[in-house]
Amino acid sequence: MVVHWTIVDEIRLLRWASEFKPAGIHKHFHMFCIVERMNSPDKYPVTLLQKETMKLGKVFTAKDIWDKLSQSYNLEKIDEMENTYSLEATTESSRNGNGNGDDAEIHEETLLELNNRIRVRKQDFTLPWEEYGELILENARKSPNSNEEYPRVEDMNEKDSTIPKESPSTDLKNDNNKQEKNATIKVKELPEYHTEENDSPIDVQKEPIKEVQSDEKELQREHMSEEEQKMKSTNKTAAPVRKSQRLKRSKEVKFEDEEKEEIEEDNTKDEEQKEKKEEIQEPKITHNEEVDKEKNENEEGDDEREKSTSYENTNGSESEGVDEGVDEELGYESEREAEGKGKQIESEGGNLKKKTENKKGDDQQDDTKKDSKDKNEPLAKRTRHSSSTGNTSNETSPKRKRRKAGSRKNSPPATRVSSRLRNKK
């Protein structure tokens, strides 16, 4: 029964054939994998760009797939490309029959596969002798260890050209024997190399240190007395003290330098404490001074207020007596303050007298004018207030009295003097 191949089926076939190539030794096993994946699209899905639906229930056989592949590929040539190496590459043991029976039974295809693996194996990189031979020789001459290697390589190349090749089994044995010999030689050379040629840097540093120590010990022995040597000889019998242990000095024993240092430390501590106390006392003193100043200012302000209140509350008679006392005090102070200024005071006194006389004349004129107005006014227009005012005058009123010319109210107001100035005077 011929199977109808759709585009989707061909795409799926090429997809699995690229993964499992049906050529070479394992072509039948690969074909088995391809058939399984073609018949189970649900289990092994393939992403497609086409939207065509697949018909389920289609079954492919290996013959159908071989026929389809043979239409587009030459399967025989593909097998030859996979099996490029001919039967000449087989081992001599298998040709001559020298090997065991197992080698004779091995299939030729398996031997070809083994040969392919050996050829594909990576080899160590080496520079071509024709182009880089001179550089290799120069480097070999410079390095002392490599002088022996390169002539050996050249000798081996000459021997290889003359001597026939041996079997790989014998080569492996020879290599193993050489490695063992080299290992034994290196082990023997190691102690000689380290002891004779190269000394470690630590040993080199220790040599001058040892010489210096020996010189110091000799000097110490010369200066040592006989008694000290005897003490050392007796101490040898006692138990030896380990180097790691250090004898601790008792606390009571103190050297002179240590005592001086302790005294200096105590002095410094005492000075620091004194400075701290002084710093604490200084702000207290300044604070007390500020408080005293504020108290003095408050007392002066209270004195001035009391004087001002007493001056306003006093009666006429008492005020005049107080004023006279104040005038006397002010006069006493002004006499001291105004020495050499008598002329100015006299001129001011004359001006004050003139002003008072002018005021008196003006008052008299005003009184005469009022009296004349009252007389000329008719009785109807006169009122109780106007009549009383018209009848009364400065001269006839019993309560009002003329003030003295030298009274304090007629004189200009005296300037106040603070208590500080009084105390100073």
Curated annotation (Swiss-Prot):
Give residue spans, biased composition: Low complexity. 386-396
Give the Phosphoserine positions (modified residues): S200, S225
Q: Name one GO cellular component term.
A: NuA4 histone acetyltransferase complex
Cell compartments where the protein resides:
Nucleus
List the coiled-coil residues.
209-310
Biased composition, class Basic and acidic residues, residue ranges: 149-163, 172-197, 204-231, 270-309, 333-346, 354-380
Which residues fall in a compositionally biased region of kind Polar residues? 408-418
**Summary of subunit composition and partner proteins:** Component of the NuA4 histone acetyltransferase complex composed of at least ACT1, ARP4, YAF9, VID21, SWC4, EAF3, EAF5, EAF6, EAF7, EPL1, ESA1, TRA1 and YNG2.
Give the protein's function: Component of the NuA4 histone acetyltransferase complex which is involved in transcriptional activation of selected genes principally by acetylation of nucleosomal histone H4 and H2A. The NuA4 complex is also involved in DNA repair.
Q: Which family does the record claim for this protein?
A: Belongs to the EAF7 family.
Q: What is this protein called?
A: Chromatin modification-related protein EAF7
Write down the species: Saccharomyces cerevisiae (strain ATCC 204508 / S288c)
